[in-house]
Amino acid sequence: MAVQKSKKSRSMRGMRRSHDALTTSAVSVDATSGETHLRHNVTADGYYRGRKVINK
């Protein structure tokens, strides 16, 4: 089992954890259907940037 040579300070622990923050996902509204969707993704009904790209 790995054992550290010396105790890590609160500062070093905080610096390591500085990249662990969660961000909210970017959501946008489709111009045609008005449906909310993730950015750079097709909506549930098949629209992307105002155009129908998936026919069901």
Curated annotation (Swiss-Prot):
One GO CC annotation: large ribosomal subunit
Basic residues composition-biased segments: 1-16
Disulfide bond sites: none
Keyword Cell wall biogenesis/degradation: no
Region annotation Disordered: where it falls in the sequence: 1-33
InterPro entries found in the cross-reference section: Ribosomal_bL32, Ribosomal_bL32_bact, Ribosomal_zn-bd
Listed Polar residues bias regions: 21-33
Keywords: Ribonucleoprotein, Ribosomal protein
A GO MF term: structural constituent of ribosome
GO BP terms: translation
Pfam families, A to Z: Ribosomal_L32p (PF01783)
UniProt family annotation: Belongs to the bacterial ribosomal protein bL32 family.
Stored NCBIfam families: rpmF_bact
PANTHER family: 50S RIBOSOMAL PROTEIN L32, LARGE RIBOSOMAL SUBUNIT PROTEIN BL32
Name of the protein in question: Large ribosomal subunit protein bL32
Protein's organism: Aliivibrio fischeri (strain ATCC 700601 / ES114)
Lineage, top ranks: Bacteria, Pseudomonadati, Pseudomonadota, Gammaproteobacteria, Vibrionales
